[in-house]
Amino acid sequence: MDRPTTYPMDQPAGFRDAQGRHGGVVLPARPEPIALDPATTFLIVVDVQNAYASPGGYLDRAGFDVSGTGPVIARIARAVAAARAAGIPVLWFQNGWDPAYVEAGGPGSPNWHKSNALKTMRRNPEANTQLLAKGSWDYALVDALTPEPGDIVMGKPRYSGFYNTPLDSTLRARGVTTLVFTGIATNVCVESTLRDGFHREYFGIVLADATHQAGPESLHRAALANIETFFGWVSDVAAFESALGVPSRAPAGADLAG
């Protein structure tokens, strides 16, 4: 019986081909560096919608603090620019449902009971058709981030981007092995999608300073700890830019801690 292939512990993590070769870009990360090939990598921007990032959006109306999203959006823009410069495709997710909320599920769905957007609308019927409804301001991406021709924009009806979407087939058709995550919320849709990717054999990397949590900042830290311990790797935007050989677009004196 053939023994499984093993690699020296001082080599970076990451996908290797049949000859044991890893991607040529090595990204500093926790718990160890990870190698990637831009040709088999996607940048995933999760749910940077008015609902999750803007005053007056769903999270704000449901009582969550969105005051810290501005700097995160700026760092997401840097990650997107770096990916484009390196030839890495960008995929934008938008979470939400049809205006009649059929896609959200009725009382027979746990989503009906757990979705804070749906609960907020039940408490405030005047918000019906406003929160996370396709075509609404709430559903739209924030003005500061704009998909470009060649990007992929994909809707999703649940926290994980793999659930009831063509994400997996889209990635496999392109030979993708590695997913770099940014977006909102670290502890909900980002972590859910990265976890599902792990179970489908994708290498998942989250750029910590280009994500924002729903809830207290401790949930952001806990999600990152969970990811780096069990499901993936944690890096930051400056390291991503540097590894790709892309000039940093950080403003002078910016705090790049992740």
Swiss-Prot record:
Disulfide bonds: none annotated. GO terms for biological process: nitrogen utilization; uracil catabolic process. The keyword Hydrolase applies. GO terms for molecular function: hydrolase activity, acting on carbon-nitrogen (but not peptide) bonds, in linear amides. Signal peptide: none annotated. The active site is at residues 47, 156, 189. CDD domains: cysteine_hydrolases. It holds the Pfam family Isochorismatase. The keyword Hydrolase applies. Coiled coil: none annotated. Gene3D superfamilies: Isochorismatase-like. Its EC number is 3.5.1.110. Keywords: Hydrolase. It catalyses: (Z)-3-ureidoacrylate + H2O + H(+) = (Z)-3-aminoacrylate + NH4(+) + CO2; (Z)-3-ureidoacrylate + H2O = (Z)-3-aminoacrylate + carbamate + H(+); (Z)-2-methylureidoacrylate + H2O + H(+) = (Z)-2-methylaminoacrylate + NH4(+) + CO2. Residues 1-23 are annotated as: Disordered. Transmembrane segments: none annotated. PANTHER family: ISOCHORISMATASE-LIKE DOMAIN-CONTAINING PROTEIN, PEROXYUREIDOACRYLATE/UREIDOACRYLATE AMIDOHYDROLASE-RELATED. Hydrolyzes ureidoacrylate to form aminoacrylate and carbamate. The carbamate hydrolyzes spontaneously, thereby releasing one of the nitrogen atoms of the pyrimidine ring as ammonia and one of its carbon atoms as CO2. HAMAP family: RutB. Belongs to the isochorismatase family. RutB subfamily. NCBIfam families: RutB. This is Ureidoacrylate amidohydrolase RutB. The gene is rutB.
